[in-house]
Amino acid sequence: MAARLHFSLGPRLAGLPLSRRGSVAPLRHGFGSAVVTAPPAEDEDFATAADLQFEPPLKVVKYPDPILRARNKRINTFDDNLRSLTDEMFDVMYKTDGIGLSAPQVGVNVQLMVFNPAGVKGEGEEIVLVNPVVYKMSKRLLVYEESCLSFPGIYANVVRPDNVKIDAQDVTGAKIKVKLSGLSARVFQHEFDHLQGILFFDRMSLDVLESVREGLKDLEKKYEESTGLAMLKILSPVLLEQVLAVFQNILLSFTLKIVY
């Protein structure tokens, strides 16, 4: 997540539950999947040594690179290489004026994120979360303006829970439980979405999405010009879940009609 994250609705409105803001439109894909909990990992879900290899200096992967939609493997090797990766990620984050960064954003498809809401090296608290899983989130929803290092120049309101509780591991492999609220919870959820292949425009309401559409098209055009590749249209995990749910409901309805 980029450092510019304004409470754009103002302190009074931003602190209100979503239900008290009549002007906020429904989310594009619904909020039921806003926080995705990762299923238990099978052996093949774990990253290999090759998956964790990287060459410094790391660079931020920009939308619409398919790396941002790829599957991210869990980590079960906690060594000097992992610590070096987290150090490099913090360096990239600070140099690009970010406050959070996920591993896939630097081209490493594993379940790892770093963040520091202060956004300045030597200030605030540096947090490293490996293999995070959300087990509880608040019902209170807030709207804040977000930006993303993978989407330069794009800023938009996104609705998220005010606080979350997390199971994760630290960089040594020790299991930890974390409760985050406010800005820290917001940054975590943004980065956690990246680990599920979810991008922040997947969370935008239709009217907000429309306001950034031209910016997205510009990034798509730059990607095609720089790579010579046409943009790969990959269905968002959030949208895919919605589509599958619709088909399941249709199938269930059809089955009931046959039975009765």
Model regions and ranges:
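Active-site rim/adjacent substrate-binding subdomains
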Residues: A2-Q189, H194-Y260
